[in-house]
Structure formats: C-alpha cells, structure tokens
C-alpha cells in the first residue's frame, strides 16, 4: 500500500504566512522561511506554497519567496496562486517548484491543464478545487473562493483528470479553518471515482480528523495548516498517531 502523505500548507499574503476561517478573517501565522524550515525538519512529506491573493489581484505568484523556500527545503514543493499560463508555470519551476497548482485559471481556460501537463508531465500538475455546498450541491468556486462557477465538484474533478491533471487538491470552503474535520462526504465522492490522487484540505482540527480523511474520505494525502502552524501538533505526532491506527505513513 502506498504511504499516506501529510502536507502542511503555507497560505502566503504580503510576505507572511496567514490563516483564516472559511477563506476570510486572515491572521498572521509566522515567517515563510521559518515555517518552511520547520516543516522540512519535521518530516513533512511535501510542502504547499499558495499565494492566496495572486489570482484575486490578477498577478503572478511571488517567485522571489518561492526561490527562498526552495533553497531551504528538500521535500517536494507545490506552488500555486496566479499560475495562469504555461509561461508562469515554467517560471515557478525555474524558481524551485516541483509541482504547480492551478485553480482559477483552470476553470476559465481548462486547456491550460493539458498544455502544462504536455510540457512538464502530469505528475507536475495539481488542480486545486475549492468547493462550497450551495442548496445541497457541491459547487466549485474560484478567485480565492469569491466566485461560484457552473461546475459541480465531481463533474469538474473528472474533467480535470481527463485533461491531464496528476493530482487534485480538494478544499472544503465550508470547513476551511474551522478545525471541525474534513468534509469526508465530498472527499469520498471524488476519491472513489477518479484514479488520480486526491489531497484532503479544509477543516483539520485534530489527529482523528486526519485519520478520518484517510478512512472515511479515502484521501491519498491530508493537507493541514492551523494545527501545524500554531504547534498544536507536530508532523511526527500526526504520523505516529496514524501509524498506531493502521495507516501506512513514512517515518
């Protein structure tokens, strides 16, 4: 069985790591480089760097910060925010990214997924899907969750897979920052019907939530921010807990 991955996420704005609730009310969560070094030493499996206001402000990701982070970590680095063209993806790779995460641009121009995958390989393309429950339906949102789209989550997940995405980063906007647990309903709906890895995101508040994301949600990886940024738990604690409960992890 493939090992399940634990992935901390650096939501970056104005040169700092931040964390909010339901994509709103951001608070400072520390220095980008200090957090990156910490997670590298903590045995995180990967690290995600998301410039959370880049797409909203129609600008490119802060590549200078990406370069600094890539020089400090020796684990796979995914970079997202403002990746709106093959050229911007290329720039991210030149600055040390191992994968790029596309979200808003993928919805407005789905062929971008295929173009990046054709040039750099599917393994380098993560499609981030931000979902919110609206009248009982899971609707995909873009622009840092500000704009609803015409897509339902499962439909969009299948489409991005067909277009060449190598992985899906699925974030529940309803659960984001609440620490109430992942939305395992939509997680399972997508994880069990696509054949590419799905990363659970949005809502991790304790180690049981990580476990349930794997067992109930069938996720391949669990992304978390608040519980790690504010040192509620360490990555090692999380992995030891999961291993004790029968989940295969790298230690």
Curated annotation (Swiss-Prot):
A Pfam family per the record: His_biosynth
GO MF, one example: imidazoleglycerol-phosphate synthase activity
Cellular location(s): Cytoplasm
Keywords: Amino-acid biosynthesis, Cytoplasm, Histidine biosynthesis, Lyase
Enzyme Commission numbers on file: 4.3.2.10
Active site residues of this protein: 11, 130
Catalytic activity: 5-[(5-phospho-1-deoxy-D-ribulos-1-ylimino)methylamino]-1-(5-phospho-beta-D-ribosyl)imidazole-4-carboxamide + L-glutamine = D-erythro-1-(imidazol-4-yl)glycerol 3-phosphate + 5-amino-1-(5-phospho-beta-D-ribosyl)imidazole-4-carboxamide + L-glutamate + H(+)
Protein's job: IGPS catalyzes the conversion of PRFAR and glutamine to IGP, AICAR and glutamate. The HisF subunit catalyzes the cyclization activity that produces IGP and AICAR from PRFAR using the ammonia provided by the HisH subunit.
Assembly, per entry: Heterodimer of HisH and HisF.
Family listed: Belongs to the HisA/HisF family.
Protein name as annotated: Imidazole glycerol phosphate synthase subunit HisF
